[in-house]
Amino acid sequence: MSQTHKHAIPANIADRCLINPEQYETKYKQSINDPDTFWGEQGKILDWITPYQKVKNTSFAPGNVSIKWYEDGTLNLAANCLDRHLQENGDRTAIIWEGDDTSQSKHISYRELHRDVCRFANTLLDLGIKKGDVVAIYMPMVPEAAVAMLACARIGAVHSVIFGGFSPEAVAGRIIDSSSRLVITADEGVRAGRSIPLKKNVDDALKNPNVTSVEHVIVLKRTGSDIDWQEGRDLWWRDLIEKASPEHQPEAMNAEDPLFILYTSGSTGKPKGVLHTTGGYLVYAATTFKYVFDYHPGDIYWCTADVGWVTGHSYLLYGPLACGATTLMFEGVPNWPTPARMCQVVDKHQVNILYTAPTAIRALMAEGDKAIEGTDRSSLRILGSVGEPINPEAWEWYWKKIGKEKCPVVDTWWQTETGGFMITPLPGAIELKAGSATRPFFGVQPALVDNEGHPQEGATEGNLVITDSWPGQARTLFGDHERFEQTYFSTFKNMYFSGDGARRDEDGYYWITGRVDDVLNVSGHRLGTAEIESALVAHPKIAEAAVVGIPHAIKGQAIYAYVTLNHGEEPSPELYAEVRNWVRKEIGPLATPDVLHWTDSLPKTRSGKIMRRILRKIAAGDTSNLGDTSTLADPGVVEKLLEEKQAIAMPS
């Protein structure tokens, strides 16, 4: 259970680490026993306009879930990420941008980024955007995406970043739910040599009759391709920024003022707008960034995540910039145009800290030594993994091949809702085990409970909960606090339920075992099965659908959809392709089912509930123990599904 082999802390890390094993134990104990003192001290990592007196004011009690940190303090996120660095480090590179095309890259200093953010902040104000308004950002991985986010934070507008891979329908849904007043996009995005029609997708999204709040669309010229233009509504980024003043005084924000909404998949269909506020979130992003990556001034840091995900918010931009770091933003993909691209970028920019996803690691691992061919990688000091549990084989390959057996791998477990790292090694403090997220970060109190909510002691397995609040915790779901309580605090009373299962070994190390609810993890991205099922049954020929995840060598999980057609409809290769494209259009390429399993009926209980447990086992080819099928209305369905499964070609 524990995988006994531990990787010791390398001498070069131990010699200069920010936190050693003794300090970890001492600080962790203090953070749990006296969170007010501990987090009161950590809050000083930021500059405050009005210093806080209160630190923690939180409740997980049923019907009274309330989370407030530093609630009487005021600050500005952009001032903490930019202005305060100007005097001593204005000429330090804030963002290294590496384009999709290997010949394109640029360095943007803190002073230049500050100037651009001030200009764009003034642009937003000129367009009538004010504190509390929601701005939707649907951008490629270009520095202007960071400028837009920081400018929103500077004036107190709430940003809602939408991943560039989402479809027009998904974009519309997020704009409607958040009542966004402005959309910021580009003519096109570029990824692995292909262009992505971002402006066209926005145009299509805004045709939805329920989108009534958007007044303007700001468009960045990325490729220069022809796009449709709506006079009066659409505005060019460059025209606006050229006439805007580079002087802007940042808005004083209360620590509990909203900073951003980020939509994440739920198990019940409609995506949830996770709301983070300003003070506690930034304290947590900066503190976790500093200690987990053992950040030293001058380090070059690269997080491969897209800005459209929480990792891009906390650990591509806000955490690093709050610490005055140099952060690398990459427009492309790790294995294009050659499998060695990621390592080439590491060498080109002399990256010291690399933070990427198991999906990328497994894709490179499949290429063997081609992934490292002709590269040196000796600048690397720390490696990190994010997005899903990393399997021990991929962990060992990453450590051995990319890090040359000298770089600790920080395998970080956290979520959109947690704002920052929850369970993670600290490089100089915790010995590593391949595949384990190891120990909790300061102030984080994990527990494993059984299905009745009873805490399980010692080496055990169970539902992963957190028993007390931490500063980076999401405060609510936008416009739906009731759903927030229902989703995270109703399963187990007085605890935050992560939706993940985990096991703890005899050393107290945590091993994440994956979702225990109906949320899939595809290439590190969360997708709700209900969301995909809703898209499937919206197809005119489909009567019913059930979606489950199956193990996939590269993506972690693949999407397996059981589909029942309307009476009189017949399966065909044409319909197979049509249904997959339909889901792609409704949600986005990420949600495209890998397998469609045509069937006449699904296993249901007498009350009509679909038995997903059985569907998961059949899809994964695990038929050794299907459990009790006596509660099924028609137990014969299972045999039929098993027969059909034999004829299905599975994705490799």
UniProtKB/Swiss-Prot annotation:
Keywords of this entry: Acetylation, ATP-binding, Ligase, Magnesium, Metal-binding, Nucleotide-binding
Record-given protein name: Acetyl-coenzyme A synthetase
Sites marked Hinge residue important for conformational flexibility: 517
GO biological processes: acetyl-CoA biosynthetic process; acetyl-CoA biosynthetic process from acetate; chemotaxis
Domain of life: Bacteria
List of residues binding CoA: 191-194, 311, 335, 523, 584
Effect upon mutating residue 584 to E: Results in a 2-fold reduction in the catalytic efficiency for both ATP and CoA. 3-fold increase in the affinity for ATP and 8-fold reduction for CoA
Gene Ontology MF term list: acetate-CoA ligase activity; AMP binding; ATP binding; metal ion binding
Homology family: Belongs to the ATP-dependent AMP-binding enzyme family.
